[in-house]
């Protein structure tokens, strides 16, 4: 059931977009600013400040939307530490590979591009690279020797996707002594020791778009790394890519092959296996601020309209694994009317709301506190959010079922105690904490021993 539940749940796609700020509570960004971010493909995204960068005035939104992809390639290039006049191989001339060709050329390097697709090789040539067309039987190692004037190339940037280990082997053969290999794509990694030992070749895997990636301290909490110690964070890589677009050193328009309105996104994803497809742009329609910023969606208007007033009418905060697989079904089976589901992400709220016949899906808890139909609130959120949500629910006169823990500190517990007794004087309310593990079969058995 757990596996089926996961497979059934929709996941937000994409991580490259450009748009206009609607709301901002951080310094440096104002409503109306044009920005790029790594937010998902959606009409509205909420993005941490370190993953968002303003777009220069002379860069159009369409080109800017490729900034994050450019930063993925740029981070791989930074790891190779190229210097002017060096020669590099780019293996795999897809979208990121072609962007890397341009950035290496802008850095004063000679570039040899390798691919099976003749058309992609032709594109790379237009950007100033020499190429190896594998579909014509050309040997990349022999060509690389000639390209490097018999010395071996200074480095190889792998932007290909294949299960074969041959890419790594050939990369090592192409390199000079102490050459560099950086993997941006995904290839087989059964390395041959001799390939690297004799030449002292370095091999490194590039992690996405730069320092800060996957670090909650940087991304979620918004703390920057000091520039004196980390010159190129992921945000500063975004800026560098946009600067190259602004100066004309990075031509994105030439790699855009298709445009789709978001209503036809399925057709766009159907092109991913098409060798002629490179840059695919999804366009969203212009909508009013009121439509874009609405916090709730009506799902099943009939579900509570004619319900018995004595029946528990429940609102849920949280739809994680335990809530969606265990608690919501348990309330539903017990005969409770499910009214409002509040989640931090709209996708999960609408999905689980429709699945369990909730009336409304929302991203704001105020839609529960101000809902007179809801008499009971179930809180299944992060532990540090429980106390304040319990207090708010009690103040609004709701019965509360909260998953353990009720609070994290004695001060929080004291506030809950006072709020509960005050609420109970004016309107009888119930507060219950769910210690669900006490009913686990093993715990029950242990108590019996």
Language-model segment annotations:
Residues 293-356:
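N-terminal Rossmann-like dinucleotide-binding module
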Residues 1-40:
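Glycine-rich beta-strand-centered segment in the early N-terminal region that forms part
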Residues 158-168, 360-418:
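Beta-loop-alpha module in the N-terminal Rossmann-like domain of NAD(P)-dependent dehydrogenases
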Residues 80-82, 122, 127-206, 371-381, ...:
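Glycine-rich cofactor phosphate-binding loops and adjacent beta1-alpha1 units
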Residues 97-98, 323-327, 386:
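N-terminal Rossmann-fold NAD(P) dinucleotide-binding loop
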Residues 407-449:
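A contiguous active-site-proximal alpha/beta segment in oxidoreductase catalytic domains
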Residues 146, 150, 155, 182-186, ...:
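C-terminal capping/lid region of NAD(P)-dependent oxidoreductase domains
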Residues 60-137, 142:
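Mid-domain Rossmann-like dinucleotide-binding core that forms the NAD(H)/NADP(H) cofactor-binding site
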């Amino acid at each position: 059931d757990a596996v089926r539940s996961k497979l059934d749940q929709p996941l937000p796609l994409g991580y490259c977009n450009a748009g206009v700020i609607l709301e901002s509570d951080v310094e440096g960004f104002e409503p109306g600013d044009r920005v790029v971010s790594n937010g998902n493909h959606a009409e509205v995204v909420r993005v941490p400040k370190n993953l968002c960068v303003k777009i220069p005035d002379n860069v159009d939104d369409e080109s800017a939307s490729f900034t994050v992809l450019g930063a993925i390639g740029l981070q791989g290039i930074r790891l190779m530490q190229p210097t002017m006049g060096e020669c590099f191989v780019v293996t795999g001339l897809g979208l990121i590979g072609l962007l890397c060709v341009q950035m290496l050329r802008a850095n004063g390097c000679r570039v040899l591009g390798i691919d099976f697709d003749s058309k992609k090789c032709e594109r790379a040539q237009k950007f100033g690279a020499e190429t190896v067309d594998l579909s014509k039987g050309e040997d990349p190692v022999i060509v690389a020797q000639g390209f490097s004037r018999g010395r071996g190339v200074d480095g190889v940037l792998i932007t290909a996707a294949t299960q074969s280990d041959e890419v790594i082997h050939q990369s090592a053969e192409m390199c000079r002594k102490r050459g560099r290999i950086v993997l941006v794509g995904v290839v087989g990694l059964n390395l041959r020791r001799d390939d690297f030992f004799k030449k002292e070749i370095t091999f490194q895997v590039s992690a996405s778009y730069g320092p800060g990636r996957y670090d909650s301290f940087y991304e979620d909490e918004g703390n920057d790394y000091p520039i004196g110690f980390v010159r190129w964070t992921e945000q500063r890589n975004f800026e560098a890519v946009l600067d190259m677009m602004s100066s004309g050193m990075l031509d994105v328009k030439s790699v855009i092959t298709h445009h789709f309105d978001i209503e036809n996104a399925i057709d766009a994803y159907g092109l991913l296996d098409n060798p002629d497809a490179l840059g695919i742009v999804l366009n969203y329609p212009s909508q009013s601020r009121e439509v874009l910023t609405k916090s709730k969606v009506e799902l099943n208007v009939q579900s509570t309209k004619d319900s018995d007033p004595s029946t528990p009418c429940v609102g849920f905060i949280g739809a994680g694994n335990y809530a969606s697989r265990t608690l919501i079904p348990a309330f539903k089976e017990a005969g409770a009317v499910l009214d409002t589901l509040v989640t931090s992400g709209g996708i999960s709220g609408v999905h689980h709301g429709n699945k369990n016949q909730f009336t409304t899906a929302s991203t704001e808890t105020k839609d529960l506190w101000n809902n007179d139909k809801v008499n009971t609130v179930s809180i299944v959120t992060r532990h540090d959010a429980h106390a304040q949500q319990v207090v708010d629910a009690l103040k609004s006169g709701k019965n509360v079922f909260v998953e353990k823990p009720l609070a994290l500190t004695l001060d929080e517990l004291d506030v809950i105690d006072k709020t509960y007794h005050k609420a109970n004087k004016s309107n009888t309310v119930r507060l219950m904490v769910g210690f669900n593990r006490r009913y686990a079969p093993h715990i029950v058995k242990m108590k019996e021993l």
